[in-house]
Amino acid sequence: MSGREQTGEKLSDSEYIEEEPRRSRIGNLKKKAFSCSTKLTHPLKMRKGKRKIDFQIPLIEDVRDEKEEKLVSKLRQQLLQKDLLPPVHDDYHMLLRFLKTMEFKIEKTVTAWEEMLKWRKEFGTDRIIQDFNFKELDEVTRHYPQGYHGVDKDGRPIYIERLGKAHPGKLMEVTTIERYLKYHVQEFERTLQEKLPACSVAAKRRVTTTTTILDVEGLGMKNFTPTAANLLATIAKVDCNYYPETLHRMFIVNAGIGFRSFLWPAAQKLLDPMTIAKIQVLEPRSLSKLLEAIDSSQLPEFLGGLCKCPNEGGCLRSNKGPWNDPEIVELVHHMEVNNVPQTTTAPLHVRDYDSTTCTISPKETLKEEPEPEEYYSSTGSRSSMHTCIVPPLSDKASTSDGDKFITTVESIESAQSQLLDADTENTFANTSVREGGQILRFGALREKINSENIFHLVKILLVFPLKLFVLFGFLLPGYWQRQNTVVVPDSSTNNKVLECFDRLKKMEKEFTEISRKQVKIPEANEKLLAESLERIKSLELDLDKTKSVLHITLTKQLQITEQLESQDEERRKGCCF
C-alpha cells in the first residue's frame, strides 16, 4: 500500500464528487485520442511490437482541360438521361477517350458508347477476368511471344510483341480465334483495371495509356496467312471500337530494309496522322533510342536493355511491373473498396477531399501553440500528417492522354488546414489532450489554425499572378496541339483496314490456286518437242550404225595388217634359204 493510504489521507466527499466527472472526461478524451492516433502509422518510424499495416492512399495528380471537362460533363448528362452510364463505367478518362475518337461530337459518341455497352453485355466482358480461363497460354506464348514487362520513364506499362517469331499456323493448332480474342479482351480489362491503376499509384500521377514495342526481326511471308489476317482484323475491330485512345506511343524495332521500304509505307496509307505521329520505326542499330523513353533496367536484353528475368519463359513471361507489388495492389484494392468518387464538374485549381477518410498521425500531441507535424516519404517529397483520398481533378491544360501534371501545393495545404479544423472540432469537442493528460481549451488551437489559414491565403494571392502567367503559357500550345491532332473517325479507319485485309485474302486465294494448278505446255510446243525427240532418237540410231560400221572397218583393217605382216615374214625366210 502507498504511504498516502497508510496514513489514511483520503479525499473529502465534495472533492471526490468534483474529481470523478473530471476523471471520466479525461478517460473519454484519452480513449478518443488513442483510437484516432492509431489510425495511421508513420512509414519511416520504427515501432516496438507487431507492426500494424494501414494503407494510406497517395495523392494522384491529374490535370484536365477546361473545355474537355465541359464536353465530358455534357456527355455524362446525356448518358445519364438515357440510362447508359453504369457506375462501373462512370469514369472521366473513359468518357474522354470516346469523345476524342468521335472528334468531340456528342451524338456520335453516345452512339459509339451504346454499341460498346451492348458488345460488353453480349461478349460477357464485365465478368471475363473471373469467368474465362485461358489454359493454353503457355503454348500460345511459345508460338506468339508477347507480354507486359516494366514501365517507361513516365510510368506507363510496356507491352512487347515479337512478331518475327510468331507462327499463326502453329498458333491455331493450340487455340481458336474465338478463344484468343477472349484472351485479348481479358488482358485489356486487366490492363485497365489493374495495371494502369497500379502504375498511377507508383508514379503518383494519372496513367491512362500504354507504350507498345513491336519487334519485327525475322518478319516475312510465313507470318502473313489467311488465319493471321482474320485474327488481326478481329482484334483491330475490338481495339478501335471498344478500347480507343489507349496507346501513347509505339516503337517498331529491328525494322529491316524490306519493312522500311515496302511494308511501312503501305501501312501509313491506312493510318491517320495522329497515329503515325505516335509510331517510331527503329533500325537494328538504333535500339539505343529506346533508352530515351525507357530505363535500361525495364528493357529486356534482346531489346538492348539490362533485364534478364530468371523465370521460365524469360522477360515476356515475367509480367514485371508495379501491378505485382503487394503493397501497391493492396492500395489499389483499398481505393476500389472505398469507392473514391469521380468528379467531372469541379472547377480548375480546386481539389475535393473526402474528410471521412482522413487519418491522424499516431504520435500527434497538441500543445498551446502546436506546430503542424511533417514527415518525408520514401520518394523525398514532403507530406502533411493528414493524408486523404484525393479524387483526381484538373489544374491546368493537359496533353492528349492527361499524363503531364502540375502540383498545386498551396491549394492542398489550404484544404488540409480546413480538414484539420473540422476534424479537431468533431473529435476533441473543443478540447485538446496532451500525453500528460492536461486539458487545454480549444480557443488557442482554433486561433493557431486561423492564423495558418490566413498565411496560406496570403501565400496563394502572392503566387496567383505567376500561376496565371504559367497557365497562359501552357494553354496556347495545348490549344494548337489539340487543333492539329484531329482524330480520324473510327469507322473510316476500320473500313480501310478491312478493305486491305480483303485484298490480301484475294491475293492469297489467287496464289493458292496458281500453286495448285499443274504446269501445261501448249500443243504446238509439245509437237515441236516431240519432233525434236524423234530427231534425237533417229540421230542416236544413225550414230549407233556408224559406230558399228566403224568397228567392222577397224577389225578388217587389223586383219589386213596382220596378213601383210605374215607375208613379209614368209618372204624374208625364203630369201635366207
UniProtKB/Swiss-Prot annotation:
It is a peripheral membrane protein. PROSITE patterns: CRAL_TRIO. SMART domains: SEC14. GO terms for cellular component: Golgi membrane; plasma membrane. Signal peptide: none annotated. Pfam families: CRAL_TRIO. Residues 1-22, 364-383 are annotated as: Disordered. One of its GO terms (biological process) is protein transport. Residues 523-550 form a coiled coil. CDD domains: SEC14. The keyword Ubl conjugation does not apply. InterPro entries: CRAL-TRIO_dom, CRAL-TRIO_dom_sf, CRAL/TRIO_N_dom_sf, PI/PC_transfer. It is found in: Golgi apparatus membrane; Cell membrane. Belongs to the SFH family. Required for transport of secretory proteins from the Golgi complex. Catalyzes the transfer of phosphatidylinositol and phosphatidylcholine between membranes in vitro. This is Phosphatidylinositol/phosphatidylcholine transfer protein SFH14. The lineage of its organism: Eukaryota, Viridiplantae, Streptophyta, Embryophyta, Tracheophyta.
